[in-house]
Curated annotation (Swiss-Prot):
Glycosylation sites: 332, 555, 567
Family label: Belongs to the G-protein coupled receptor 3 family.
Source organism superkingdom: Eukaryota
BP term (GO), one: positive regulation of insulin secretion involved in cellular response to glucose stimulus
UniProt keywords, alphabetically: Cell membrane, Disulfide bond, G-protein coupled receptor, Glycoprotein, Membrane, Receptor, Signal, Transducer, Transmembrane, Transmembrane helix
Gene knockout outcome: Deficient mice shown normal body weight, an increased fat mass, decreased lean body, hyperglycemia and insulin resistance, proteinuria, renal calcium, phosphate wasting, impaired bone mineral density and defective testicular function. Conditional deletion in Leydig cells leads to decreased male fertility.
Keyword Signal among UniProt keywords: yes
Any Pfam family: ANF_receptor
Originating species: Mus musculus
Gene Ontology molecular function: G protein-coupled peptide receptor activity; G protein-coupled receptor activity
The protein's name: G-protein coupled receptor family C group 6 member A
InterPro entries listed in its UniProt record: ANF_lig-bd_rcpt, GPCR_3, GPCR_3_9-Cys_dom, GPCR_3_9-Cys_sf, GPCR_3_C, GPCR_3_Ca_sens_rcpt-rel, GPCR_3_CS, Peripla_BP_I
Membrane topology field: Multi-pass membrane protein
TM region(s), chain numbering: 595-615, 631-651, 670-690, 707-727, 751-771, 785-805, 813-833
Length: 928
């Protein structure tokens, strides 16, 4: 194909090597008269040729690289204006147009803008400087264009001088939405803010977070890249590299920069997705070289080139990988298709691009449609051959389908909307004016109406928002190979307001899912149960995966941090993907330890019943009588039974009633039991006391019923205050990581301690009294056993304190149960078991005579000891008196001693002791 083009070129006859325009009219590309003139700016050529003059002169040069797609855009504007002229919208008012070729150069666009702003019907073609342009009549009333954002920015700054409406069909730079800087600019496409937002959303949804970006070094490229970078960061997407290419093909460094960009793409092997904000000719050159280097990636196309046929038809373009792009929402363009079918009959006298296209088609008449675009772009305005009009028409007729194939429906529709918006605004403005007159209205008046106009394309209604934008949305397109040809397929729609992709069928949904199979990440994906941990890289997308700690979880991939479980109700192990509900634990009835403790409690109750039966059947025996009688024994046995029964409230699911009952029941019943033991200790001590003063004191103190009631009553008051002021209650202990301990919270540690402390004080008093009576007769040694019982109690509860404070969990109640059982069994065994042993095994000693003999022997032994003590004491006194006293004093002493002789004093003392012994035996017998 290249050889054929070269051959054709060699036979060209160069007819024109002069400058592109001699007069301003030569600068006009397409023109048609009308009552109201509309300007148009289109980059019909992709570059302007450089001047060979030295030094360079300020002259407009010829252009090269005919852009078929942009040429079709000029035809779309012409067709849309003719649709309005042929309708009844303006009632006889005809719209005219002046369309200029910017050659993708801002300079050329500004030159055309100067002509737009020049004074109407002035032969000098000048822009008149004025302080007030309110009544100024320029050459045109409004401008459609330009396509590229950088050009529109420059043009808009000039049009702002007269507030001339400018409606762009393709410029998407976000900065143009700023109505302070660009008050007269409007557009029929969305801002790049929405496009970059949609791109970032697509990338995130596809699971990519490590991408590259390529843009141009101009206003559009820099602004688009900055906006995209912000949107990408908000979606946790990192840009591995940002490559910037020169804005114009005339730049000598563009080839070098493209090669450097491709080297960067190859070097970043983990980057498989690249966002491209470039012009069509940049993409064409980039892709051509990328195919040569066998680079295959996912290319995210901007709306500038996503549907460009020139790029889609690049040979072997499928080797580049997948192309996913965003295109302007398309509408009904069927009438434009019909217009193209009759293009060969359209007059081209005032349509230089059409005439040029016809000549290019003629020059490339032997080229196939697939290569025609490349052939056409190789010519410049200075290297064309001219043919007869009839021959040109024949070639155009043969190439009608080729033109339709190069149509970009989204852009064609946007141009139609721009023309329709102006048409409806002019209609509203001309309802009370004669718009056939050139001075019917000024451009700034049209701008005011245009901002608020509601217009239609025949089906849908539209209006500009506060920023002058028409947010029609985007089509998400995918390049697919069909029958050996690359085609553009609509994959989804992007809703700007809801920020969602709307798929139309199952096939497109499948295409979306296939995108997720491609990996483009800096780091390996963190699985559920892990979280990302930053590394030394400056990018947040480069990380390492670490497991979630205990009580944390992550249920999605690539989570930035693990989520905390609700520690009160849930838990999670290390590297968990979910939270598990905590198991509620308490000392349940089916627990082996609980069963053992209950068995011991029931055994204790059985012992109590057995002892009660034994005592009842042996009610008249001395052992039972010496124990205080059946009433005292029953009271103590009932207290023991209640103590054993209270352990049942420590087992099972805690309830408020059980929590309040268990400590109160134990405290009151155990206090009553200890109070009874206290009275027994006092009675024993009183019965066998030899000290007259102590005996008198114990007789005054010994009041059994008041002692029991008082001691027990104090404990009742303590427990009552406890229940009223800070009653125990059920509490969920959540301090353990995996379980909830359902337990009784004692309410007040002070009250709990006071209750136990009070019992301890009573037990200590009992211990002291019992210890004093530990040397009683062998068959009457109850005090000795009481001493052992109290010692067991003290040991048990002293051990309880550290064990209770250090034990945690569901077995905490078991600690108190064990202590209760030990203290209860200790007292029960020490008080009642010896008596039962005597009743059952030593019945001979369980008689009144045996007890009297035992008491007599003990009393005699006690009296002999007492007599010996008195004799020793009296002898010592006598010797002292004999040695130290005078005869007179001796006489006084004798008189004081009942007037007995001095030599019988020892015998007199012995007699008194024997008398006391008789009295003591009578007292012991009465106590029995």
């Amino acid at each position: 194909m290249a050889l054929l083009i070269t051959v054709v070129t060699c036979f060209m006859i160069i007819l024109d090597t002069s400058q592109s325009c001699h007069t301003p009219d030569d600068f006009v590309a397409i023109t048609s008269p009308g009552h109201i003139m509309i300007g148009g700016l289109f980059a019909i050529h992709e570059k302007m040729l450089s001047s060979d003059d030295h030094p360079r002169r300020p002259q407009i040069q010829k252009c090269a690289g005919f852009e078929i797609s942009v040429f079709l855009q000029t035809l779309a504007m012409i067709h849309s204006i003719e649709m309005i002229n042929n309708s009844t919208l303006l009632s006889g008012v005809k719209l005219g147009y002046e369309i200029y070729d910017t050659c993708t150069e801002v300079t050329a666009a500004m030159a055309a803008t100067l002509r737009f702003l020049s004074k109407f019907n002035c032969s000098r073609e000048t822009v008149v400087f004025q302080c007030d342009y309110s009544s100024y009549m320029p050459r045109v009333k409004a401008v459609i264009g330009a396509g590229y954002s950088e050009t529109s920015i420059a043009v808009s700054r000039m049009l702002n001088l007269q507030l001339m409406p400018q409606v762009s069909y393709e410029s998407t730079a976000e900065i143009l939405s700023d109505k302070i800087r660009f008050p007269s600019f409007l557009r029929t496409v969305p801002s790049d803010f929405y496009q970059t937002k949609a791109m970032a959303h697509l990338i995130r949804q596809s699971g990519w977070n490590w991408i590259g970006a390529i843009t141009t070094d101009d206003d559009y490229g820099r602004l688009a890249l900055n906006t995209f970078a912000i949107q990408a960061a908000e979606n946790n997407v990192c840009i591995a590299f940002k490559e910037v290419l020169p804005a114009f093909l005339s730049d000598n460094t563009i080839e070098v920069r493209i090669n450097q960009t491709l080297e960067k793409i190859i070097a970043e092997a983990q980057v498989n997705v690249i966002v491209v904000f470039l012009r069509k000719f940049h993409v064409f050159n980039l892709f051509t070289k990328a195919i040569e280097r066998k680079i295959s990636k996912i290319w995210i196309a901007s709306d500038n080139w996503s549907t460009a046929t020139k790029i889609i038809t690049i040979p072997n373009v499928k080797k580049l990988g997948k192309v996913v792009g965003f295109a302007f929402r398309r509408g009904n363009t069927s009438s434009f298709h019909s217009f193209l079918q009759t293009l060969h009959m359209y007059p081209n006298d005032n349509n230089k691009p059409l005439h040029e296209f016809a000549m290019l088609v003629s020059a490339c008449k032997y080229i196939k449609d697939g290569d025609l675009s490349q052939c056409i772009s190789n010519y410049s305005q200075a290297t064309l051959t001219y043919d007869t009009t009839k021959t040109i028409e024949n070639h155009l007729f043969k190439r009608n389908d080729f033109l339709w194939h190069y149509t970009e429906p989204g852009l064609i529709y946007s141009i139609q909307l721009a023309v329709f918006a102006l048409g409806h605004a002019i209609r509203d403005l001309c309802q009370a004016r004669d718009c056939k007159k050139p001075n019917a209205f000024q451009p700034w008046e049209l701008l005011a109406v245009l901002k608020n106009v509601t217009f239609t394309d025949g089906r849908n209604s539209f209006h500009f928002d506060a920023h002058g934008d028409l947010n029609t949305g985007y089509d998400v397109v995918l390049w697919k190979e069909t029958n050996g040809l690359m085609t553009v397929t609509k994959m989804a729609e992007y809703d700007l307001q809801r920020d969602v992709f709307i798929t139309t069928n199952q096939e497109t949904k499948h295409e979306f899912r296939k995108l997720k199979q491609i990996l483009s990440k800096c780091s390996k994906e963190c699985s559920p149960g892990q979280m990302k941990k930053a590394t030394g890289s400056q990018h947040s997308c480069c990380y390492e995966c670490v497991s979630c700690p205990e009580n944390h979880y992550s249920n999605e991939t690539d989570m930035d941090h693990c989520l905390l479980c609700n520690n009160e109700t849930h838990w999670a192990p290390v590297r968990s993907t979910t939270c598990f509900e905590k198991e509620v634990e308490y000392l349940d009835w089916d627990d082996s330890l609980a069963l053992l403790l209950i068995a011991l409690s029931l055994l204790g109750i059985a012992f109590v019943l057995a002892i009660g039966i034994i005592f009842t059947r042996n009610l008249k025996t001395p052992v039972v009588k010496s124990s205080g009688g059946l009433v005292v024994c029953y009271v103590m046995l009932i207290c023991h039974a209640l103590n054993f029964a209270s352990t049942g409230f420590f087992i099972g699911e805690p309830q408020d009633f059980a929590c309040k009952t268990r400590q109160t029941l134990f405290g009151v019943s155990f206090t009553l039991c200890v109070s009874c033991i206290l009275t027994k200790s006092l009675k024993i001590l009183l019965a066998f006391s030899f000290d007259p003063k102590l005996t008198m004191f114990l007789k005054c103190l010994y009041r059994p019923v008041p002692i029991v009631l008082t001691c027990t009553g104090i404990q009742v008051v303590i427990c009552t205050l406890w229940l009223v002021l800070a009653a125990p209650s059920v509490e969920e202990n959540i301090s353990l990581p995996r379980v909830i301990i359902l337990e009784c919270e004692e309410g007040s540690a002070l009250a709990f301690g006071t209750m136990l402390g009070y019992i301890t004080v009573l037990a200590f008093i009992c211990f002291v009294f019992a210890f004093k009576g530990r040397k009683l007769p062998e068959n009457y040694n109850e005090a000795k056993f009481l001493t052992f019982g109290m010692l067991i109690y003290f040991i048990a509860w002293i051990t309880f304190i550290p064990v209770y404070t250090t034990t945690f969990g569901k077995y905490l109640p078991a600690v108190e149960i064990i202590v209760i059982l030990i203290s209860n069994y200790g007292i029960l065994c020490c008080i009642f078991f010896p008596k039962c042993y005597i009743i059952l095994c030593k019945q001979k000693t369980n008689t009144k005579s045996a007890f009297l003999q035992m008491v007599y022997n003990y009393s005699a032994h006690s009296v002999d000891s007492l007599a010996l003590s008195h004799v020793s004491l009296d002898s010592t006194s006598y010797d002292t008196a004999t040695t130290n006293q005078s005869p007179g004093n001796k006489m006084t002493a004798c008189q004081n001693d009942n007037h007995l002789p001095a030599q019988v004093l020892p015998h007199t003392g012995t007699a008194k002791t024997i008398k006391a012994s008789k009295t003591l035996r009578q007292k012991r017998s009465s106590s029995i």
